[in-house]
């Protein structure tokens, strides 16, 4: 018997999970690396504050405006192929963004934003397709992974820029995750297939629960998702949360440098405290404690409000509210999309509902950095 055959099912399942989480890491690294480098980038390219704010708004604007198109692309290509498209566009955009000119910075950022827009739909669809029985856990891991990679990028982007320049640092924090994630994605989620690789499904035991939900095809039962009141309630809530998050996270490193005399690296780490622990608490609240959705969302909102209140009243005490709002930010994202996936009867309904919510939320959020700047 080969060594591969002797691996337990849990080990094979973990390989599939790692392949998915590697993809999730790419969804935030290309965007999260820019705020701590914004001062250097703006100085070298001669950008004013408005241009810098516009640059940080480009990906979020893409997430909003391009989501309807991305939804059609995912439906046309399928989940696995669309995920590979995300990785390719992120890599191409990052290389162009680091070319060292203003137009390249904006053009590359648009390409990155367009690619990640597709990925923002792919990730919850993979969870709904392959991990629907552990939705809260996998959505929490998805959100937490995004925030961990942002933490690493913001902590190390400036030190790396001191060695290889901001262009090299910005490119590295996309290229390395993309290449690693791409290798795993090709192995675990082969293009052209609507499920993980068959041999992995069989060895992991996943074949027992990956059923007709894997098919990304239209469903006609019930009203269209955009006619459902619950869809718009979730869209408005997501819009408010993303506006607040991107408004503060887009400029928090710069504000901490100016107001508290922190180093650029220290400011990046402080800003990246937003959202690591929270997502992991979502499966605890939903599954272990069995809290209803209303209680979960109420606790999350209370934690989030601590940050704007503290920044207005006592900005020198930023650490605790940053941690509380970080818990809230990550937890809200995970909780919201857990509800979306659970309430979707198929992967296709998941895609359409997510598209409505993200279009609304990110269009509102895109003006956050400019307004707060």
What are these regions (language model features)?
Residues 66-78, 280-293:
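Helix-to-loop junctions at the C-terminal end of transmembrane segments
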Residues 2-10, 189-234:
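Juxtamembrane intracellular "pre-TM" segments in multi-pass secondary transporters
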Residues 65-103:
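Conserved MFS/SLC helix-loop-helix module at the cytosolic interface between two early adjacent transmembrane helices
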């Amino acid at each position: 018997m080969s060594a591969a055959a002797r691996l337990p099912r849990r080990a094979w399942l973990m390989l599939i999970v790692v392949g998915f989480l590697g993809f999730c890491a790419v969804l935030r690294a290309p965007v999260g690396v820019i705020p701590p480098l914004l001062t250097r980038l703006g100085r070298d390219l001669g950008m004013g504050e408005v241009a810098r704010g516009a640059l940080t708004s480009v990906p979020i604007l893409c997430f909003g405006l391009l989501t309807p198109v991305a939804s059609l692309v995912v439906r046309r290509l399928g989940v696995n192929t669309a995920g590979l498209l995300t990785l390719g566009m992120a890599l191409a955009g990052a290389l162009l963004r680091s070319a060292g000119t203003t137009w390249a910075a904006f053009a590359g950022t648009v390409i990155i934003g367009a690619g990640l827009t597709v990925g923002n739909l792919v990730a919850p669809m993979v969870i709904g397709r392959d991990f629907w029985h552990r939705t809260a856990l996998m959505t929490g891991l998805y959100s937490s992974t995004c925030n961990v990679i942002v933490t690493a990028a913001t902590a190390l982007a400036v030190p790396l820029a001191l060695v290889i320049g901001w262009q090299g640092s910005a490119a590295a924090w996309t290229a390395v995750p993309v290449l690693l994630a791409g290798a795993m994605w090709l192995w675990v989620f082969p293009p052209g297939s609507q499920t993980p690789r068959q041999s992995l499904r069989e060895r992991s035991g996943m074949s027992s629960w990956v059923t007709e939900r894997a098919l990304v095809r239209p469903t006609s039962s019930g009203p269209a998702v955009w006619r459902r009141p619950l869809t718009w309630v979730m869209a408005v809530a997501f819009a408010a949360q993303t506006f607040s998050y991107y408004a503060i996270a887009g400029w928090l490193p710069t504000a901490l440098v100016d107001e508290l005399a922190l180093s650029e690296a220290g400011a990046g780490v402080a800003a990246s405290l937003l959202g690591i622990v929270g997502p992991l608490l979502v499966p605890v609240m939903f599954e272990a404690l069995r809290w209803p959705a209303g209680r979960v969302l109420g606790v999350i909102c209370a934690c989030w409000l601590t940050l704007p209140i503290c920044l207005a009243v006592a900005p020198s005490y930023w650490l605790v509210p940053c941690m509380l709002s970080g818990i809230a930010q990550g937890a809200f994202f995970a909780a919201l999309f857990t509800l979306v996936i659970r309430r979707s009867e198929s992967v296709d309904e998941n895609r359409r509902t997510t598209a409505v919510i993200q279009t609304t939320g990110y269009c509102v959020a895109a003006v956050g950095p400019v307004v707060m700047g």
